[in-house]
């Protein structure tokens, strides 16, 4: 089963408002990613730009409206993610706990439907 592991950052945390991680954190993340690949859990991962780089698109009424900035103003934001393969939620949570330690941030785990 595949799981979405969201990396949650905040504007007052260890990363800057640009969403950058320290070189030590990046090295730890790279090592964790290598382990995910080696153990067959890797599907995909990526970091995301800072919330200030977001554009909200709303085309519900048939005419697209583009709004600069994040959908929701918040101290916490989605800084990156992993998509992992795990046989069950327990394994996914163990991997997420390791990911949280390596990136020095909170993470949220959700199964894909």
Describe the function of each predicted region.
Residues 1-113:
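Conserved, structured core segments of small domains
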């Amino acid at each position: 089963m595949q799981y979405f592991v969201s990396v949650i950052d905040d504007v007052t945390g260890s990363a800057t408002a640009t969403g950058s991680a320290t070189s030590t954190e990046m090295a730890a993340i790279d090592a964790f990613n290598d382990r995910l690949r080696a153990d067959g859990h890797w599907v995909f991962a990526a970091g995301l730009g800072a919330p200030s780089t977001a554009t909200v698109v709303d085309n519900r009424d048939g005419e697209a409206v583009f709004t600069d900035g994040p959908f929701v103003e918040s101290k916490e934001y989605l800084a990156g993610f992993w998509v992992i393969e795990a046989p069950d939620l327990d394994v996914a949570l163990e991997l997420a706990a390791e990911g949280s330690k390596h990136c020095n941030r909170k993470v949220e785990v959700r199964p894909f439907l």
